[in-house]
Swiss-Prot record:
NCBIfam families: PRK00011.1. (6S)-5,6,7,8-tetrahydrofolate binds at residues 133, 137-139. Its EC number is 2.1.2.1. The modification N6-(pyridoxal phosphate)lysine is found at residue 242. It catalyses: (6R)-5,10-methylene-5,6,7,8-tetrahydrofolate + glycine + H2O = (6S)-5,6,7,8-tetrahydrofolate + L-serine. PROSITE patterns: SHMT. This is Serine hydroxymethyltransferase. GO terms for biological process: glycine biosynthetic process from serine; tetrahydrofolate interconversion. The gene is glyA. InterPro entries: PyrdxlP-dep_Trfase, PyrdxlP-dep_Trfase_major, PyrdxlP-dep_Trfase_small, Ser_HO-MeTrfase, Ser_HO-MeTrfase-like, Ser_HO-MeTrfase_PLP_BS, SHMT-like_dom. It is found in: Cytoplasm. Catalyzes the reversible interconversion of serine and glycine with tetrahydrofolate (THF) serving as the one-carbon carrier. This reaction serves as the major source of one-carbon groups required for the biosynthesis of purines, thymidylate, methionine, and other important biomolecules. Also exhibits THF-independent aldolase activity toward beta-hydroxyamino acids, producing glycine and aldehydes, via a retro-aldol mechanism. Keywords: Amino-acid biosynthesis, Cytoplasm, One-carbon metabolism, Pyridoxal phosphate, Transferase. It comes from Methylobacterium radiotolerans (strain ATCC 27329 / DSM 1819 / JCM 2831 / NBRC 15690 / NCIMB 10815 / 0-1).
Length: 434
């Protein structure tokens, strides 16, 4: 065997056969540590979930090798006949899940899905209406640093101070005053249902498009445990992770064929080139899972668990914005306890409970500090936690935060260590990827 042939064989064997632990031990170690974190800590970040092994397998498949600019049957590259199958399945399953006529599954994120809608429906400088970030909106709904706040003219509505519910009178007043091109319902920190019919009525009164960003509650909509944006919305955007429990990505849904064509053009070639076909395959798998009866049981449990967690925290003396939750998330207002979200997040992290600091309506703290934390139940529910477990978790949180309030920013190390031990005992009862 010549030296060249031997080298070629060695390259082929190692390149295509070497596992990650051999090919890149540093990355392998980081992955292993992250797996351990997910297995042994309680995940309460509302935007996170735990996907099935089937979704992981699809996303880590050879479809990552394929470029496929365009749409199924209309690609700019050859060899797309099999990735077309994956995308067609994702599209058809999405349409069944949300009972709509058109779906674009190519956006790489919820943010890009929103950008696609903006590109299709507005011109730079046009006005749109969205929920204020401080009241539970999202960066892509007009925050000044975001492209939505730089290229367009956002006008923000907020919640009522007395009950932290959407102020629909203000929405109507602002719509009449500013005549927006688009009105958005949806956000990242609003725990109540949205009055989609009233939003559409307001949009129609000023000739605006009504857009729903259901990134956080799409899985609940798919399962029928949350009101659907359709038939009220002209367009709905979503992520495909969060409550939908798929890979990280985005999607645009509509019943309007003319708008669907605009959204398709906005995503490709407007914003993206070749779509991530391995991620689209993962989306198809997740949508297939969401069409099964088991997913409805899961989604109902997500909501029941969230209510149980909120009730436990209220019983423990903590304030929940709007007094509770209708979906998978809640905001804990820590102002009455004299705590910041930053300190609470750190204390809970030391006890192996993961959440995120979050602003609360009319917050006076900086966004990097905040007066609250956001909690969600999707990931815990995916691993099997029920109402009893979330009541227990609520008790853990009360213990840690009470210790923080008593001891100061360093927290109560003895309480945190004790809670961490009980957290591990709980997660050991509900293993993932074992």
């Amino acid at each position: 065997m010549s030296a060249g042939t031997a080298a070629d064989k060695h390259f082929s064997n190692s390149f295509f056969a070497a596992p990650l632990t051999e090919a890149d031990p540093e990355i392998a170690e980081a992955v292993a540590k992250e797996l351990g974190r997910q297995q042994h800590e309680i995940e309460l970040i509302a935007s996170e979930n735990i996907v099935s092994r089937a979704v992981l397998e699809a996303q880590g498949s050879v479809l990552t090798n394929k470029y496929a600019e365009g749409y199924p049957g209309r690609r700019y590259y050859g060899g797309c006949q099999f990735v077309d199958i994956a995308e067609d399945l994702a599209i058809e399953r999405a349409k069944r899940l949300f009972d709509c006529g058109f779906a674009n599954v190519q956006p790489n994120s919820g943010s890009q899905a929103n950008q696609g809608v903006f590109l299709a429906l507005m011109q730079p400088g046009d006005t749109f209406l969205g929920l204020d970030l401080a009241a539970g909106g999202h960066l892509t709904h007009g925050a000044p640093p975001n492209v939505s706040g730089k290229w367009f003219k956002p006008v923000s509505y907020t919640v009522r101070r007395e009950d932290q519910r959407i102020d629909m009178e203000q929405v109507a007043q602002l719509a009449q005053e500013h005549k927006p091109k688009v009105i958005i319902a949806g956000g990242s920190g609003y725990p109540r249902h949205w009055d989609f019919a009233k939003f559409r009525e307001i949009a129609d009164s000023v000739g605006a498009y009504f857009m729903v960003d259901m990134a956080h509650f799409a899985g609940l909509v798919a399962a029928g445990v949350h009101p659907s944006p359709f038939p009220h919305a002209h367009v709905a955007t979503t992520t495909t992770h969060k409550t939908l429990r798929g890979p990280r990505g985005g999607m645009i849904l509509t019943n309007d064929e003319a708008l669907a064509k605009k959204f398709n053009s906005a995503i490709f070639p407007g914003l993206q080139g070749g779509p991530l076909m391995h991620v689209i395959a993962g989306k198809a798998v997740a949508f297939g899972e969401a069409l099964k009866p088991e997913f409805k049981i899961y989604a109902r449990q997500v909501v029941e668990n969230a209510r149980a967690l909120a009730d436990t925290l209220i019983s423990g003396g903590y304030d929940i914005t709007s007094g509770g939750t209708d979906n998978h998330l809640m905001l804990v207002d820590l102002q009455r306890k004299g705590l910041t979200g930053k300190a609470a997040e750190a204390a809970l992290s030391r006890a192996h409970i993961t959440c995120n600091k979050n602003g609360v309506p009319f917050d006076t703290q900086k966004p990097t500090i905040t007066s609250g934390i956001r909690l969600g139940t999707p990931a815990g529910t995916s691993r099997g936690f029920g109402v009893a477990e979330f009541k227990q978790i609520g008790g853990f949180i009360v213990e840690v935060l009470d210790g923080l309030a008593a001891k100061g920013e360093a927290g109560d190390s003895a309480v945190e260590a004790d809670v961490k031990t009980r957290v591990h005992a709980l997660t050991d009862r509900f293993p993932i990827y074992g």
